[in-house]
Amino acid sequence: MITKLIPRKVFFTSGVGLHSEKLESFEVSLRDAGIEKFNLVTVSSILPPNCEIVTKEEGLKELSPGEVVFCVMSRISSNEPGKTLSTSVGCALPRDISKHGYISEYHAYEENAQDVGEHAKKLAGSMYSTWTNEAPLKTFSIPRSSSVQESGDWMTVISAAVFII
């Protein structure tokens, strides 16, 4: 029998990491977001039908270190001093929970968190409306922004929607 991997729950998180090595700055951003213990697999932009949105704390209780975890992630890195890095995931909730919604990911240089968050909400809402010909029940986003320090160390900023099967 084939088991369908349809997430039951989702939580949203973000993080910032700084390190002299690019890869390690990503690891630090995962730690800041609280999702460093998992083998993350990025997926595209569907919020499954009947998927419950939970807090990060509730979601983390259901996951185990080393578990393969699916997520929609926005990620950006740079070591250019003073450069602003911003990420966001946006979500469009369906009017009927038995239908799917959308999750968008967006990142940008030199844009603030509010603008990136608004853009991610707009993307998710647009994907939903062009499918249903109606506005979503609600849109929201989880933006994060930070500026690279003068030291020139690598900075990585992430935002993620993390699924629980």
Swiss-Prot record:
Residue(s) carrying Pyruvic acid (Ser): S45
Sorted UniProt keywords: Decarboxylase, Lyase, Pyruvate
PANTHER family: PYRUVOYL-DEPENDENT ARGININE DECARBOXYLASE (PTHR40438:SF1)
Protein's UniProt name: Pyruvoyl-dependent arginine decarboxylase 1
Gene assigned in the entry: pdaD1
EC number(s) per entry: 4.1.1.19
One Gene Ontology MF term: arginine decarboxylase activity
Cofactor note: Binds 1 pyruvoyl group covalently per subunit.
Names of required cofactors: pyruvate
Residues with site note (Cleavage (non-hydrolytic)): S44, S45
The family this protein is said to belong to: Belongs to the PdaD family.
Pfam short name (any one): PvlArgDC
InterPro entries: Pyr-dep_his/arg-deCO2ase (IPR016104), Pyr-dep_his/arg-deCO2ase_sand (IPR016105), Pyruvoyl-dep_arg_deCO2ase (IPR002724)
Reactions it catalyzes: L-arginine + H(+) = agmatine + CO2
Biological-process GO terms, alphabetical: arginine catabolic process
